[in-house]
Regions:
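Short hydrophobic beta-strand element within catalytic cores of glycosyltransferases
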Residues: 258-261, 271
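Donor nucleotide-sugar binding/catalytic pocket of nucleotide-sugar-dependent glycosyltransferases
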Residues: 62, 75-76, 80-156, 216
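Short alpha-helical segment that forms part of, or immediately flanks, the ligand-binding pocket
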Residues: 226, 249-254, 268-269, 275
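Conserved acidic donor-binding segment of nucleotide-sugar-dependent glycosyltransferases
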Residues: 273-274, 278-285, 292-299
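Conserved donor-binding/catalytic core segment of Leloir-type glycosyltransferases
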Residues: 122-124, 160-178, 182-189
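Acidic donor-binding loop of glycosyltransferase active sites
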Residues: 230-244, 257
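A short, well-ordered alpha-helix in the C-terminal region of glycosyltransferases
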Residues: 287, 294, 301-316, 322-328, ...
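Nucleotide-activated donor-binding/catalytic signature segment of Leloir-type glycosyltransferases, i.e.
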Residues: 204-227
């Protein structure tokens, strides 16, 4: 019970945060992840002290205990339409009844208390899809801005060039929700080299499936990973869950490499089908095979697609662009907080 109360509202964290805010006197507080240790207590402290607060929505935990709307191999949106208590009996959080109950309690408590309507000045969603999901859950539309993630340009001193080797790349956690099984199933019928970079619970399955056309590289450092991505014909992102963003997508764009991704969630708003990549039906190895074969047989068009992907990165996902949007959100939050009453 003590753990449940701490996740819903941590008195220890609230005292520490209040002390730090009083010491530092910030113009604004920007909260990224509060779960599980800080708890939404941070928003109440900021409200009490009259400090504007911005919160970035990095996942869906605040409206669905699964954090991804993914359960037992499929998308599950019940938490948008009803309470989250159903998740407790399904062990959606770390396969634990108690853990799932605690997270569901947090979701329902702050829904009841109106925390998200009354204690936060501005929210940042990473994509339009993510913003719409929060609005569907009843969050205030007028308070949610869109600001994507960004990465430093990994190749400022090098130009995008024609790929010399022919291969595809998967980079990510090796788990069910990332679509790893779909990828492996598709590659049984694809004669084209694929390099798999990552680690996770399905690692043994992936390593055992390695063959002439499928190479498991395990975990790689960032520089090596980006080099593999830069030289690839395409990157594959076969996720089965709703992701608020796809960092690997903008990494691929920065490398001048197009993306083949599931036609699902935020990916649809990040990838322009046929322009910066291709979209396939989620969970369908047949659809994925079709898109890979198109890439294999149209390498000149794939190169042009990569140039457009690189342009997309420069237009939307650079630190400079991110800074401008962030400052705009901060200014809004400060302005809107000036006249508020608590």
């Amino acid at each position: 019970m003590k753990a449940a109360v701490g996740v819903v509202y941590s008195r220890k964290s609230s005292q520490a945060i209040e002390s730090e805010i009083r010491r530092f006197s910030p113009d604004l507080v920007h909260v990224h992840n509060y779960f599980p240790l800080i708890s939404p207590a941070v928003f109440y402290v900021c409200k009490y002290l009259g400090v504007p607060v911005v919160h970035t929505l990095h996942n869906y935990r605040a409206i669905c205990p699964t954090a991804t709307f993914f359960h037992k191999g499929r998308i599950e949106e019940r938490s948008l339409k009803e309470s989250s208590w159903w998740t407790a009996s399904k062990k959606v959080y770390r396969e634990s009844y108690i853990g799932s109950f605690i997270v569901a309690t947090m979701v329902e408590a702050h829904k009841y208390l109106g925390t998200w309507q009354n204690k936060v000045d501005r929210f940042i969603a990473l994509t339009d899809f993510s913003r719409k999901k929060y609005i569907d859950a009843g969050w205030p539309e007028s308070k949610i801005s869109i600001k994507p993630n960004f990465i430093e340009d990994p190749f400022t001193d090098r130009k995008v060039f024609r790929k010399t080797d022919a291969y595809g790349v998967f980079v990510g956690r090796l788990s069910e929700e990332k679509g790893v099984n779909v990828l492996i199933d598709a590659w049984k019928n694809i004669n084209f080299p694929l390099k798999i970079i990552g680690e996770g619970p399905l690692e043994s399955i992936v390593s055992n499936k390695s063959a002439d056309s499928l190479e498991f590289l395990g975990r790689q450092d960032r520089r090596s990973t980006l080099d593999f991505m830069r030289n690839a014909d395409f990157i594959i992102v076969p996720s089965l869950c709703y992701e608020t963003f796809g960092v690997v997508i903008i990494e691929s764009f920065a490398c001048g490499t197009p993306v083949i991704a599931s036609r699902l969630g935020s990916f649809e708003t990040m990838i322009e089908d046929g322009v910066t990549g291709l979209l396939f039906e989620p969970g369908s190895s047949e659809s994925l095979i079709e898109k890979v074969q198109w890439m294999m047989h149209n390498r000149n068009l794939v190169f042009e697609m990569g140039l457009r992907a690189r342009h997309e990165y420069l237009e939307k996902y650079t630190p400079e662009n991110n800074y401008k949007i962030t400052m705009g959100v901060y200014e809004q939050a400060i302005e809107e907080a000036k006249g508020r009453q608590w």
